[in-house]
Amino acid sequence: MQNTTVHGLYFCHPTSIDGNPELLAVSRRSLSRGDHVTFTASQCRPKRLQCCQWHSCTISSTHIPTKDDLGKSFAYLRLLFSLDYTIADVLLIIGGLLFAICAGIPFPLLGIVFGDLINDLNTVTCSSSDRATADLSSAVRAKVLYVIYITIANFCFIYAHSTCWCLVSERLARRYRRRYFESIIKQEAKFIESLPSGDVVSRLVSDIELVQSGTSEKVGLVISTLSYFVAAYVVAFIKVPKIAGMLVSVVPCFFLMALGGGHYIKKFAGRLAEKVNAATSIASSSLSHLTLVHAFNANDRLEKRFAGYLLQSRKDAVRKATTHAAQLGCLYFIAYSANALAFWEGSQMISKSVADGNSGTSVGAVYTVIFVLIDASFILSQVAPFIHVFASAAGASERLLQVINRPSAIDGTSDSGDKTAAFGEEDIRFRDVHFKYPSRPDVPVLQGVTFNIPPKKHTAIVGPSGGGKSTVVALLERFYDPDSGDVLIGDKNFRDINVRYLRGNIGYVQQEPSLLDRTILENIAYGLVCVTEIVDLVKEAAANANALGFIEALPYGFATNVGTAGNQLSGGQKQRIALARALVREPCLLILDEATAALDSTSEQLIQAALNRVSERVTTVSIAHRLATAKNAHKIVVVQSGRVTEEGSHTDLVSRGGVYAEMVRLQNLGKLSLDDRVISGDMISALNATPETRQLLDEKQAFVDGNRSDITEDTVVADTPSDSRDGSEEEARKKRKRTRSAGFVTRYTFALIRPNLHWVLLGLAMSVIIGGSYSAEAIVFGHTVGSLSPCRSAEAISRDGNLYGLLFFILALVEFGANVVGGCAFGWAADKVLYRIRVLSLRSLLGQTVKWHESEDRTPGTLLTYITGDASALGGITGTTIGLLLATAVNLIGGLVISFSIAWKITIVLFPTIPVLLVSGMMKLRVQKQLAERHQKAFAKATAVTIEAVDNIRAVSAFSLEKQSYQVYGRALRGPYRATIKATFHGNAWLALAFSISNLVYALAYWWGSKQIAEGRYSQTQFFIVMPALLFSTQSCGQMFALAPDISKAGVASSNIVELLTTRSAEDEVTPGSSHSFQPSSSMGAQLRDVHFTYPHRPERPVLKGLNIDIKPGQFCALVGPSGSGKSTTFAMLERFYRPNAGAVVIDGVDVTRQVGTEFRDDIALVPQQNILFEGTVAFNVALGACPGHEPTQEEIEEACRMANIHDVIMTLPQGYQTMCSHDGKQFSGGQRQRLSIARALVRKPRLLLLDESTSALDVESEKRIQEALATLAGRTTVVAIAHRLNTIHRADQIFLIEDGRCIEQGTHQQLIQRSETYRTSVIHQSLET
């Protein structure tokens, strides 16, 4: 192949989905993304990557069914033949059906062979002639060969039907995945937002897994089981009709037990899962927002709520354990009772035959009937759970098909509609538009909105939050259609315009930027539609969005991956990328929804200048709370309560003295002198041109959100050790972890279990009884078979039949009692231990420092596994798992002791087969489990692609990325599908071998046993004691090996839990030299003295460089400065989320960096930049801010909400303060969430209040009300605010100007205007004076 030189950027995507490196090739005329297969199909054909930077690059080219489940099963056939099935699918289904039927027949045939072998043994026992011995040897050899032939056929049939059904399920699941994604990605926003929270994830993960599980090898197993059942009864009725008829009663007994028990287990398990999930949600939110939890010392309140949900689940957990134990006890009782009945009736029939002197009923015939019917009935009872699986699969397919077959009301992939609308040339008109969101149909959002948007002009929409501004934008993008009224461009209705064409003419920047988990280059380039010139356009757009500087400063530049939801970037950085994505397509209509809200005033001014240049040739619609960004608009529309109250230019609206004029008055920073304006005007031009300014724009923004370590605007996070003190503490913890022995872990784990040891001991005692009962059964079984020999008298046969039938029934009662008592004891113990571990784990996690949470690649998700994974694994080992282990161990030891003591010569030959049977049992269970787990894990990343697309559905729709997202999803499916198919072929071979190999061991046992009996070394009774005692018990012990992964997980979990619970928090460690206590006063003072600080994960970039500020008690102070200068980090120091590398943080005269404990936080309240709500009522979220130990009254909560201007909004809700908040609080607007955060801080009645951009999302009126409330705190509360809106802090007693980690200037607003050109420039940028 000939080499090709291509100019551009080539790099390898680091996270390939299917194991093949994913490549992205960008030339100046094309953008290509794909793996090796994709590129080899193209003309370029790259084989390897030779560069990763800009230059000329040469490339060498189980559950039980209910009545509803049974009803749903009738839809199962529609599932198998749904979604464009092919002839290959039909052939696989037919082949799987026929092979499964054939696979059920060999087992009854083996029952006949084994019964004939017993008759042969009876013959040689009754006659000791040489001829009888020779005949026996010949007969045994023939029958052993039959067993071998049947086993081989059985292996082939099982492998064939398992493979066929696995292929059917994988092909069907892939079709469902593709079609569901294709449908969901093109649905309108109204439908997506009407779905319950997590519905799409549930459909993709749960429902498609149900479809896959319900059409997999389980179908073949059920069909073969039904075939086995039918064949078994045919054989039984041919052999001994009377006993067969009696044992028919076993079938309904098994089914009644399974149906009744399964119904209640499902009921209690559902309730249990609901409450545990609620508790897990609390834990997840707490870990995700740890800084807020620490700020309010809310550990105890959240732990109490977490424990409350777990306590509510206790009753259902106990009921579930009791029901499961009773079900298991009934299962064994029915099986042993059926044995007692069958052997007793068989003994009477054989006794009568002997008394009458005819052949009649033979022992072998009785054995065959019991062997095949008890086993068939037992196995058939195991079919019951699969009925639920199949019904669930049918129900899941119906739910999926509802979406798959649903036509989208606003389809962005359709080619229908008008494509001639002249965007940028004609007016856009709203004409009497009314609208309500589907989630709130009783709340009108727009009520007769009418206004025009002139072409190639800038129209700004302003007004209070919740007034309907963003809804206007949503209608322009046609995320929704109006309930009534029209949106027109010229004379064309938006409803009649092709959706893809409409959105292709619009550039859209959301209030909360949405980025996909791709590179920066791709995220910006997604704004292009059918454009070949990419790289230059992307760079130009990035420059216009003031993003080029920080992008090129990143280690991988435009090739940097932004992470899930852009979490590798700061808020300002994401906003600039989103802006560049909108600008790159050079739209006819540019929509900006608070596009510069996260930027400082200088950055905002530079971007605003670029937008002003763009608006000269583009129709621009902007939404803004900062009126400084809207005052130069050609037209301003004031939207209030869903209506247009005013419209006109800035000058006109101010002169009218209406709503807009009042908003301007509230935001105006004060009138500067003419000289100030002239000087500042000259300075602006100079400042915009200086390298220092651009450097400031690229500075990192530290501690951006309140729940994680902050990500700068210039680097992607990399884990690095922190300062020397924290580093030494971490090393000490690692050393303690290494020195903790297995004995220490065991002792600590035992201490966790000790309070419930009596339940565990009771369960262990029952396990010993259960394990011993298997050996007892072998003894009874051997004597029963021996007592039925026709060589004995009729009276002896009848007498012993009564005795051993009674013994079997006694065993049934013992098994029932032991399983019920043991199951309940273990279930209760496991639940209590699990509760204790989960609560202690959450307590320890919330008690660790922020630094600990950020080290060693810890994330909220991985830490949550202590509660969900490790606690469950450790709790499980204290439950039925340990009981099963002990029972199987007793069973195996008892079997070996009995076998060697009764017939050691038989045992010594069969003993080497024990590992074979153990591995057989292990593989049968393990392969089935691994196939299910592999399938689930393989498609996890493909599911993540869908979740990302749905979470960012507005961005996907706005930039017409539906087809591109579908292609990404298709690539994500390709590798996992191939891997799963490959695993199916070799996995099913192990499964078939596991089901078949035990028959060969039985053949060896009968051959060797018959040889020993024929030679007179052992009796038939001894042989039939040894065989079940050794082989049956050994085969059941294979479960012990299948439990090995669970045991291993429990061991690892035990070590993890002990390490967590014994890890001391650094908050409890005090540096010698300070032991002062805090003295309450009316307000709190604070000083930062020569503070130096570097974030642990960015040691090469100091954030604070000798910061000195002095906050006097009772003052209102403000921190201002460019993004990344260290303002939020200052708050982190005051809250002691981190300890400084050097310097002191003094609060009320006490250096808190040297102080033990966190009691000082009781007098501090924080309003973080990110508005965070926890799952719970509104009242709970507000009360969370109260001081530890104090439960605020309803009056205190309402007072705080009134001060935050949110009380009236809460009272309009149907449930008022008892309204439930979701974990993300999405049912509230951004401004409402911010006001709830402020109320949470105010209910604390703090002496020091920290406000980090606390009014950035508020309208002017709400901002005014909160400013008034803060004014009432003067004197008794020290207030420190970080703000980009300078009008919110211009009355501050002291303003600290922070730049590059230092305080470069301080003073009042008027003093800084006179002394600081930087501050004066920011004031002028935000001034609304004309």
From Swiss-Prot:
Entry function: Pleiotropic ABC efflux transporter that confers resistance to azoles such as itraconazole and voriconazole.
SMART domains documented for this protein: AAA
GO molecular function, one term: ATP hydrolysis activity
Protein family per UniProt: Belongs to the ABC transporter superfamily. ABCB family. Multidrug resistance exporter (TC 3.A.1.201) subfamily.
Gene3D superfamilies referenced in this protein's UniProt entry, alphabetically: ABC transporter type 1, transmembrane domain (1.20.1560.10), P-loop containing nucleotide triphosphate hydrolases (3.40.50.300)
Name used for this protein in its record: ABC multidrug transporter mdr4
A GO biological-process term: transmembrane transport
Glycan-modified residues: 3, 707
Membrane topology: Multi-pass membrane protein
Inducing or repressing factors: Expression is induced by voriconazole exposure in vitro and in mice. Expression is increased in clinical azole-resistant isolates and by the presence of itraconazole. Expression is also up-regulated during biofilm growth. Expression is repressed by iron in an SreA-dependent manner. Expression is down-regulated by tetrandrine and posaconazole in a synergistic manner.
GO CC annotation: membrane; plasma membrane
Species annotation: Aspergillus fumigatus (strain ATCC MYA-4609 / CBS 101355 / FGSC A1100 / Af293) (Neosartorya fumigata)
InterPro entries: AAA+_ATPase (IPR003593), ABC1_TM_dom (IPR011527), ABC1_TM_sf (IPR036640), ABC_transporter-like_ATP-bd (IPR003439), ABC_transporter-like_CS (IPR017871), P-loop_NTPase (IPR027417), Type_1_exporter (IPR039421)
Substrates-to-products reaction catalysed: itraconazole(in) + ATP + H2O = itraconazole(out) + ADP + phosphate + H(+); voriconazole(in) + ATP + H2O = voriconazole(out) + ADP + phosphate + H(+)
Stretches for region Disordered: 717-736
All copies of domain ABC transporter, residue ranges: 428-666, 1086-1325
Disulfide bonds: none
TM spans (from-to): 90-110, 144-164, 218-238, 243-263, 324-344, 370-390, 761-781, 806-826, 871-893, 903-923, 989-1009, 1023-1043
Source organism superkingdom: Eukaryota
